[in-house]
Amino acid sequence: MKGQTGLRSLALLYISPLYILERLPLKLSAPDTLVVRGSFIVPTEPLYPSITMVQTNLEVVDDTLHLPRILCLHGGGSNAAIFQAQCRRLIAQLRSEFRFVFAQAPFLSDAEPNVMSVYSQWGPFRRWLRWCPDHPEIRPEDAIRAIDDCLEDVKRQDDAKGATGAWVGLLGFSQGAKMCASLLYRQQIRQELRGRSFAGSDYRFGVLLAGRAPLVSLDPDLDLNSSLPDVSQITDAKYHGPSQDVLRIPTVHVHGMRDPHVDLHRQLFEEFCAPESRRLVEWDGDHRVPLKYNDVSLVAYQIRELATQTGAP
């Protein structure tokens, strides 16, 4: 009788998937041991006996379904599962306020070097944009369609899980941050020309981690007077401005001060985002997502401030 009571008590335990992930070794074989389900990362093979027992007896309840949603775009040569792991500390600080949904880029790619050093077994790796001549050429309209399809697919999948929160923000790292800024700029142009109800999206803010200039054009029919490169071009070289394409939707930019390309990140901040709507967080790190508590807290604070400023529900 006493043993049965103990088992029932064990079945009621809740172990956060983020708690599990933060205690795993850095070099994981993710496809073999983890599966991403909405906002959760759960083991598919026994990692530790106690975890297996709890997972077997417990149906995890997702308590973020009603929260406002932030769509997250990974960097080039990465993927959605890797980016979710990289953002685990940020999610932990904001999980009672926002639901984070991670999109998968449409095009296959080699792993980015920093990704390869930690997540070499987490492939396949993907990209949003071309960054080297070896990437196959593609027509701009086909690239835009593939990107939009990926984003709409992940939104529909999240709706199907029962999520109901408004899509209030975009969050991206590196190439994903460039995509987030470009998506916000497209929304801004559409809202100016068509009105807010016909823009196709209504994101209130963007969180741009190590995002580099320039923006890319995601709607050539509307950007008739734009000097932006199209989405099919290689755009990693320094952009020679000044730019007439200025994003006014509020953004927070996160720059690692030891990132070798921080000058390109500053160019996106200074030349492509309006002074009255941009914020900056600088931290002592290189080209990666912040993980230390104090660094993450600065980013989380600015996200809360943006949400308040923009009236995000």
Swiss-Prot record:
Purpose: Esterase; part of the gene cluster that mediates the biosynthesis of the mycotoxin citrinin, a hepato-nephrotoxic compound to humans due to inhibition of respiration complex III. The pathway begins with the synthesis of a keto-aldehyde intermediate by the citrinin PKS (pksCT) from successive condensations of 4 malonyl-CoA units, presumably with a simple acetyl-CoA starter unit. Release of the keto-aldehyde intermediate is consistent with the presence of the C-terminal reductive release domain.
Keyword Hydrolase attached: yes
Origin superkingdom: Eukaryota
Family: Belongs to the LovG family.
Leading EC class: hydrolase
Keyword Hydrolase: yes
Molecular functions per Gene Ontology: hydrolase activity
Gene: mpl1
Pathway recorded for this protein: Mycotoxin biosynthesis
Keywords recorded for this protein, A-Z: Hydrolase
BP GO annotations: secondary metabolite biosynthetic process
Active site: S174 (charge relay system), D259 (charge relay system), H287 (charge relay system)
Cysteines paired by S-S bonds: none
EC code(s) of this entry: 3.1.2.-
Cellular component annotations (GO), alphabetically ordered: cytoplasm; nucleus
Protein's recorded name: Esterase mpl1
InterPro entries per UniProt: AB_hydrolase_fold, FSH-like_dom, LovG
